[in-house]
Amino acid sequence: MPVFRLSDRLVFPSPHLARHDGLLCLGGDLTPERILLAYQNGIFPWFSPGDPLLWWSPDPRLVILPGQLRVSRSLQKRINRNVYTITMDQAFGRVINACADLRNRSGQGTWLVQEMIEAYIGLHERGYAHSVEAWNAGTLAGGLYGISLGGCFFGESMFSTMADSSKTALAALDRHLVKQKFDLIDCQVKTDHLVSMGGVEIPRKDFLTRIHGSLEKKTIKGPWIFTGF
């Protein structure tokens, strides 16, 4: 399959035309309108420093269904002991920067370039991007962030500096989405970590069918408030 080049027009090629590795197109911009249109069509931006802006729609797609998150006994004990205090949308900028910084310090490099960080902070200010924070004694110990549209939460990244802090944040997100009757959490691509917590791969065509139906629901904009496990 060819890789398409985007013009200034606010349009994407069909995600079914993506290459076998999931790469669909390059170019365009990171305006809020384009990013939201991408998610509505099962597409997301992902590129490294020095690369052109790349857009992806992998097949299969990893998802977690709200209410089916797998919580280990050790994690449940931490939750029961209130090791972490959970908040939502209280430190979005700190969470997204921590996700980028942790990968850089680990030597993995990061796709969270400054342009991406600024774009998602802009989406947070518009009420579409959300963060979940896990605090320990007033210190931000872990968290995650993503985009909410309709009944879908499109997860982007998470970080952890203390044991099970990001897992606790994910468990809190799952509980919140169950209460709000969300349909799925998009995890994009398979990782052993997410599979161990209940992530399942589904064909892209099934993923697109699910999100297109779920996007008929009203988008619940932020700030979100966590009401407990």
From Swiss-Prot:
Keyword Acyltransferase recorded: yes
InterPro entries from the UniProt entry: Acyl_CoA_acyltransferase, Leu/Phe-tRNA_Trfase, Leu/Phe-tRNA_Trfase_C, Leu/Phe-tRNA_Trfase_N
Molecular-function GO terms, alphabetical: leucyl-tRNA--protein transferase activity
Keyword RNA-binding carried by entry: no
UniProt EC number: 2.3.2.6
Function: Functions in the N-end rule pathway of protein degradation where it conjugates Leu, Phe and, less efficiently, Met from aminoacyl-tRNAs to the N-termini of proteins containing an N-terminal arginine or lysine.
NCBIfam families: aat
PANTHER family per the UniProt record, alphabetical: LEUCYL/PHENYLALANYL-TRNA--PROTEIN TRANSFERASE (PTHR30098), LEUCYL_PHENYLALANYL-TRNA--PROTEIN TRANSFERASE (PTHR30098:SF2)
Protein name, UniProt field: Leucyl/phenylalanyl-tRNA--protein transferase
Native species: Desulforapulum autotrophicum (strain ATCC 43914 / DSM 3382 / VKM B-1955 / HRM2)
Classification of source organism: Bacteria, Pseudomonadati, Thermodesulfobacteriota, Desulfobacteria, Desulfobacterales
